[in-house]
């Protein structure tokens, strides 16, 4: 694809110093555009990144037997009244609630527990119909009083929410723990190192839940972890500030050998064991093998693809721009031509024919401007075709400083092998 016809181009204007790194780089590089505080358009580059993130999530969830669907975002009040959450003060603070012209009350979705349970009530009759594992990717709305930090905290954002329904607590936790492990794999494939942190259930459940946190100085969350300086200690203690009862420097309550340290972090996922709260409230039961009516055991699991994109930029950047992990980059190659356009066209065609995604900067601007734009956009590889390189191609990785001269076949082999390794 040619950059000369790509929409939009990167921007040259300066941004406020207090703007978050993810907002500054994503807006400047043309990945997103801000409509208002907490609401962003995913431009073509940003859309490609989020789609790559979604595809990784989708692949791993499908392996667990989960099925994808799509549910409404506009919810009638009566379904939420069944659980009492419509009038819950904590819910009312974040849920957009309003009346239509007939006076009927509705809410914009910030989650889908009630909607899934309502669906199960129509579809589930006996234990033979369970378990059920369904998920969707959809826009969520939250009346966020602190819509800041770029796309890390918004009023409107993309969320993947998975829901599982089971015949027993044992079966629920079996799948819950499987998803916990799958989340770690998902984040690893995306390129993020995460900590699994015990947390409160918030407005979802009175049980403790688990969050997946990325360490970052710009994070709004505070977590407390066991500082295992002794390599023989394999303690995994980690809690967020809402449930941790101690302070920095305390002895670890789990291993009693190490001390507790606090850190700032960005939450990129969460999972909730909901139990039978929703099925009992909404009167959704199944018939067991002995003919008895039993409540469904329920759990929910969230990941925010747009928040992940913001977290990636906060973690992977330098003073020149973004450094995308190879698994989620919008294009693998940024191709630069310096007065050898015919040759560049041929190389671009060969690369695309080999299944490599290329953005070809064919604009009539200086080499320095093209190189700066390559660094800003942050694709894994920059290729340069020029008189100086002869019949070779200058090959440079975004997160490295070395420049190599490679043949086209070598480039295809190098990039192709790396792309294949990540799938």
Task: Please report, for each region that a protein language model flagged, where it lies by residue.
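NTP/phosphate- and nucleic-acid-binding module
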Residues: 1-423
């Amino acid at each position: 694809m040619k950059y000369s016809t790509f929409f939009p181009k990167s921007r040259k204007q300066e941004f406020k110093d207090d703007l978050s790194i993810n907002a500054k780089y994503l807006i400047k590089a043309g990945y997103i555009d801000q409509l208002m505080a907490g609401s962003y358009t995913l431009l073509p580059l940003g859309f490609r990144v989020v789609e790559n993130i979604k595809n990784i999530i989708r692949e791993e969830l499908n392996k667990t037997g989960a099925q994808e669907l799509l549910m409404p975002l506009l919810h009638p009040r009566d379904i939420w009244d069944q659980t009492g959450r419509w009038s819950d003060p904590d819910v009312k603070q974040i849920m957009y609630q309003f009346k239509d012209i007939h006076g009927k009350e509705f809410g914009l979705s910030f989650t889908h527990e009630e909607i899934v349970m309502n669906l199960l009530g129509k579809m589930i009759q006996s234990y033979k119909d369970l378990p059920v594992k369904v998920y969707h990717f959809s826009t969520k709305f939250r009346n966020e009083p602190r819509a800041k930090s770029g796309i890390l905290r918004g009023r409107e954002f993309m969320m993947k929410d998975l829901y599982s329904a089971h015949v027993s607590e044992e079966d629920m936790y079996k799948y819950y723990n499987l998803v916990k492990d799958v989340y770690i794999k998902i984040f690893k494939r995306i390129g993020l190192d995460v900590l699994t942190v015990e947390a409160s259930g918030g407005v979802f459940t009175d049980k403790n839940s688990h969050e997946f946190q990325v360490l970052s100085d710009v994070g709004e969350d505070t977590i407390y972890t066991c500082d295992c300086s002794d390599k023989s200690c394999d303690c995994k203690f980690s809690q967020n500030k809402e449930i941790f009862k101690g302070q920095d420097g305390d002895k670890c309550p789990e291993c009693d050998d190490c001390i507790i340290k606090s850190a700032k972090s960005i939450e990129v996922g969460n999972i909730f064991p909901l139990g039978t709260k929703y099925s009992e409230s909404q009167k959704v039961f199944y018939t067991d093998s002995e003919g008895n009516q039993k409540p469904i055991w329920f759990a929910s699991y969230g990941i925010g693809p747009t928040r992940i994109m913001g977290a990636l930029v906060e973690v992977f950047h330098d003073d020149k721009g973004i450094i995308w992990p190879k698994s989620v980059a919008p294009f693998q190659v940024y191709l630069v031509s310096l007065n050898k356009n015919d040759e560049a066209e041929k190389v671009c065609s060969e690369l695309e024919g080999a299944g490599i995604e290329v953005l070809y900067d064919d604009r009539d601007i200086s080499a320095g401007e093209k190189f700066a734009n390559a660094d800003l956009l942050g694709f894994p590889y920059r290729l340069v075709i020029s008189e100086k390189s002869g019949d070779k191609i200058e090959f440079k990785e975004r997160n490295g400083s070395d420049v190599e001269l490679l043949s086209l076949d070598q480039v295809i082999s190098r990039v192709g092998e790396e792309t294949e390794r990540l799938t």
